[in-house]
Amino acid sequence: MIVSKKMIKEVSRSLLPFSDAVSSELPMSSLLRLSLFQVSVGIATVLLVGTLNRVMIVELGVVASLVATMVAIPILLAPLRAILGFKSDNYKSLIGWKRMPYIWYGTMWQFGGLAVMPFSIIVLSGDQTVGPWWAGHILVAFSFLATGMGAHLTQTAGLALAADRATDQTRSQVVALLYVMFLLGMGLAAVAFGFLLADFTKFKLIQVVQGAAVVTLLLNLIAIWRQERLKPVEKKNIYKTEAAFIPIMRLFLKSQGGRSLLLVVFFGTLGLSMQDILLEPYGGEILGLSVAATTNLTAIWVIGALVGLFIASRSLKRKKGGPIRSIVFALFIAIGGLCLIIMSDPMNLVSLYYFGSFLIGLGTGLFAVSTLIIAMTIPISKGTGRG
């Protein structure tokens, strides 16, 4: 039997993951390089809601309520993503960049926050010789604020840029691939941080967090290099009045399914994110696990999220109600995972703790991809875009 080039190409496209995300406007090499910004956001996420959360409470003895407040700052900034995306949709530039400035500013915020974060945490823990007692509180709040704002800004503009370059046929697959890269970034970061902080010292903490800042800068520089096509705006049009955010938001809420989508995303994300602050300290304080053991928990969560992504990709191929069914299924799975984690201490079974985390990741993966695909396929109207 003679195998033709066409047959080889068809087999390759069916076997290679996300091969159908490629288009002439966004080839695989550019897509994979662009997706590196998701890896940097994954690194920041692991640090903010996982590793540093547990380190501050268990190793450095910071009060849990104070740590929860600091970790909540980046999460509370999440609603600003709607405004940031809207601004990038309507940004006018003489050079012709629309998304790139926002990704770059986000990178700078992220880099700056991570650069000062380890010293701020050490001061907050009580290792302070000069300055007011509240200096550590202000410094840590600023570093978490800067890193969280940078991650939100980078991710929002980066996803919008990818959606701009993708076609209508490939957009959902591009979104799924970018989410996979985000999960891989989290998983690799969790394993790396667990290994590097196995024998915890303050000096190692400084090395790890500042190393993450440098890696973030390099990854984002590689990701955005020559990714956006230049579309210069004439000087006379720069100062023309642009669409206002509030009227556009009202128009979106009046559209079919707009209000429901926002409510589902808000409460679903709130429920799936609240456990992030407590999960690793719970393993350290209640179950007596080491830094490496609790940080590797994130890797287990990532595996669950990847499984959820695979399930979502299968179920969303159905024409009727695919995303809606996936969202409901995801929330019930996550509730079951939380119940297992609660029962892990009374039953003295660490395996329940890990399996519960896997189920939460599974539910989160299903939920995130389903809501992202619904949002990215909303028709564009005047004054709005993919941001």
PLM features: residue spans?
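Intracellular juxtamembrane helix-capping segments at the cytosolic ends
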Residues: 153-166, 366-382
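Short amphipathic helix-loop junctions that connect adjacent transmembrane helices
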Residues: 50-66, 277-294
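Hydrophobic/aromatic end-of-helix segments at the C-terminal termini of transmembrane alpha-helices
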Residues: 48-55, 158, 162, 274-283, ...
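Juxtamembrane helix-start elements in MFS-like secondary transporters
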Residues: 64-71, 136, 175, 289-298
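Intracellular loop-helix junctions on the cytosolic face of multi-pass helical membrane proteins
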Residues: 1-28, 127-143, 153-159, 165-266, ...
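C-terminal ends and interior cores of transmembrane alpha-helices
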Residues: 103-133, 332-348
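C-terminal transmembrane helical hairpin of 12-TM major facilitator-type secondary transporters
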Residues: 324-371
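Helix-to-loop junctions at the C-terminal end of transmembrane segments
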Residues: 79-96, 197, 308-324
